[in-house]
Swiss-Prot record:
Cross-referenced InterPro entries: ATP_synth_asu-like_sf, ATP_synth_asu_C, ATP_synth_asu_C_sf, ATP_synth_F1_a_nt-bd_dom, ATP_synth_F1_asu, ATPase_a/bsu_AS, ATPase_F1/V1/A1_a/bsu_N, ATPase_F1/V1/A1_a/bsu_N_sf
GO molecular function: ADP binding; ATP binding; proton-transporting ATP synthase activity, rotational mechanism
Protein known as: ATP synthase subunit alpha
Keywords: ATP synthesis, ATP-binding, Cell inner membrane, Cell membrane, CF(1), Hydrogen ion transport, Ion transport, Membrane, Nucleotide-binding, Translocase, Transport
Length: 514
């Protein structure tokens, strides 16, 4: 038996050690101290960024939100049932990113951009940061192009422009979502891409929205981001930012996009839940101190950007085109209280609001837009010329009607002028009614407004206004298709169009029935 010399053994071991290739890897790791209600406290992590992704065993990720002296508070993105005390937590050095691009059009994704519609993976997509800084003052352009919602009451009295933030506010179940969905449906041929963000809604409601968009041919140019009521508060809080990043993809490349946040009240509630679980001090209505910043940093990202911005962003690939992201945030009020904390915050951030009223909705006026308190601060400059020209008297007529209607309840004998004003107001109110999922073209809308503005409705019974309008539009689209096409393309109002509309309505009233 051969004897091994100890010195030979040590030489062999030394040789092996020298040849061993070990690369040292510095890792920032900590230990999970507590897990409860989707909030994880981690001890031992150093150099963590606010909003940084933290990796836990089993492919679970969290987001650092509280950076304290000796621990980090993180919110778990998704299920946290597999996490336990004593587990390791690693910094990734990355912030949260979601997929962006045209591959998402027609798809339903969650707050992290994962498809949830059963149509397979998204394919090759770019990713972009969820939290981004809004474009600066120098890169912005004034709002001067319209977004047609297809609603007479909105496009005539509270016009929305590309790059505007227009709040839709009102109590529950009075048509806020219906208004936003119809605005999306109306964009199917306008070249505007749409993003619908559902926050804290029932899954059956989201499924119904998807079905309606598909039935009306608008799903193909819409991205739906769904963070339903069954999702964690963290995902409901993140969903609007994810949707905004997806919309910014189009804005930054010289396209136009429209985003609907349905609704930001539920996002504020989710953020309040996260903040209270992170032991942050509560303020008014138990919301944290930065709830204004929660919404302002989101809504400031909706803007119209200049040609220079688009050219710089695309490295010269796109020139001479402006981009826009128009936001329609929705806020739910309690018993019409617009002076609550979150509604007042969002009203002060946005460029106007469409106020929907329960009393009007219950009396059959739908959409229940209260023209008196609704306003569009920048949309007037973007309004289509013909609509602007014909809608001047509509808002005044409605405002005077509401004032006189209250007065007329107490007065028995009214003079002729007051009676005419009341009757005109009633007819205009009736004309502003519109069915759901039936957005109107510019020409159809112009025709209705022209009939009201020029007194062609004076001899029509109030109960017959709706059927008169439908028959009139059908008649014009059949017998005066060229005139309607010209209005739709140009949107101008001149003597020729004035004469054409007048002659057509006179002929219709003389020869047709309704």
């Amino acid at each position: 038996m051969q004897q091994l010399n100890p010195s030979e053994i040590s030489e062999i071991i030394k040789g092996r050690i020298e040849k061993l290739d070990v690369t040292s890897q510095a890792r920032n790791e900590g230990t999970v101290v507590s897990v409860s209600d989707g909030i994880v406290r981690i001890h031992g992590l150093a150099d963590v960024m606010y909003g940084e992704m933290i990796e836990f065993p089993g492919g679970v990720y969290g987001m650092a939100l509280n950076l304290e002296q000796d621990s980090v508070g993180a919110v778990v993105l998704g299920a946290y049932t597999t996490l336990a005390e004593g587990m390791s937590a690693k910094c990734t050095g990355r912030i949260l990113e979601v997929p962006v691009g045209k591959e998402l059009l027609g798809r339903v994704v969650d707050a992290l951009g994962n498809p949830v519609d059963g149509k397979g993976p998204l394919g090759n997509t770019e990713t972009d940061a969820v939290e981004k800084v809004a474009p600066g003052v120098i890169w912005r352009k004034s709002v001067d192009q319209p977004v047609q919602t297809g609603y007479k009451a909105v496009d005539a009295m509270i016009p929305v422009g590309r790059g505007q933030r227009e709040l839709i506010i009102g109590d529950r179940q009075i048509g806020k979502t219906a208004l936003a969905i119809d605005a999306i449906i109306n964009q199917k041929d306008s070249g505007i891409f749409c993003v619908y963000v559902a926050i804290g809604q029932k899954q059956s409601t989201i499924a119904n929205v998807v079905r309606k968009l598909e039935e009306n041919g608008a799903l193909a140019n819409t991205i739906i981001v769904a963070a339903s009521a069954s999702e964690s508060a963290a995902l409901q809080f993140l969903a609007p930012y994810s949707g905004c990043t997806m919309g910014e993809f189009f804005r930054d490349r010289g396209e136009d996009a429209l985003i609907v946040y349905d609704d930001l009240s539920k996002q504020a509630v989710a953020y309040r839940q996260i903040s209270l679980l992170l032991r942050r001090p509560p303020g008014r209505e138990a919301y944290p101190g930065d709830v204004f910043y929660l919404h302002s940093r989101l809504l400031e990202r909706a803007s119209r950007v200049s040609e220079e911005y688009v050219e710089k962003f695309t490295n010269g690939a796109v020139t001479g085109k402006t981009g826009s992201l128009t936001a329609l945030p929705i806020i739910e009020t309690q018993a019409g209280d617009v002076s609550a904390f979150v509604p007042t915050n969002v009203i002060s951030i946005t460029d106007g609001q469409i106020f929907l009223e329960s009393a009007m909705f219950n009396s059959g006026i739908r959409p229940a837009v209260n023209a008196g308190v609704s306003v569009s601060r920048v949309g007037g400059a973007a309004q289509t010329k013909i609509i602007k020209k014909l809608s001047g008297g509509i808002r005044t007529a409605l405002a005077q009607y509401r004032e006189l209607a209250a007065f007329a309840q107490f007065a028995s004998d009214l003079d002729e002028a007051t009676r005419k004003q009341l009757e005109h107001g009633q007819r205009v109110t009736e004309l502003m009614k519109q069915k759901q999922y039936a957005p109107m073209s510019i020409a159809d809308m112009s025709l209705s407004l022209y009939a009201a503005e020029r007194g062609f409705l004076t001899d029509i019974e109030i109960t017959k206004i709706g059927s008169f309008e439908q028959a009139l539009i059908a008649f014009f689209n059949r017998d005066h298709a060229d005139l309607m096409a010209k209005i739709n393309v140009k949107g101008d109002f001149n003597d020729e169009i004035d004469a054409g509309l007048k002659a057509g309505i006179e002929k219709f009233k003389a020869t047709q029935t309704w």
